[in-house]
Amino acid sequence: SLVNGQMSYMTESFASMGTNQISVNVTNLSTRSVSVDEMYEFYEDNRDLFAQMTPNVTVSTTVKNGTESSTSTTVSGVSEEYLEMKDMELEAGRFIQYSDIVSRQKVCVVGYYVAWDLYGGVDKALDQTIKIGGNAFRIIGVVSRQDDDELESGGSDDFVWMPYSCAAKMTRNANISSYTFA
């Protein structure tokens, strides 16, 4: 079919560019929305094309530890597959699990900069509470340092990842519209 032919062409095109991820934004569907379950069904039906998928929910908010706060930190809701998709590793702790997503556990994984800037170190950040938009989350993991040059506000180590189910609730967004496939 035309769609399968186009998908094959696109897959070859992405492979030739060295790109192994594709972002999908579902917008302008005035009569209906596409649910997370429907996107997972699409993903499962196309496992020959995709190894992983994650919904992405961006949260614009402040993160705090006591009186220390950051407005430059990127806060995102992701799935349990995100760490592997980003080809990153944990410095300490564990990553978000499927059970965290289903039960909307208020847990998060932070970047190296956040651990040092707000807590003074990786070990000091682990199992501590971080306020995200006024909500208390427990830090369950710290991602290994990404930026070899310097740790800086707004840099590649300045992020917090939480279960996408929590992020969707925080943003009062019942319809997640951004997904990444790998």
Predicted region positions:
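Hydrophobic secondary-structure segments that place a key small or acidic residue at a functional site
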Residues: 56-57, 68-178
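Long, amphipathic alpha-helical coiled-coil
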Residues: 1-3, 178
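Hydrophobic, regular-secondary-structure patches
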Residues: 3-74, 81-84, 117, 168-171
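Short aromatic/hydrophobic contact patches that present stacked aromatics
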Residues: 23, 178-180
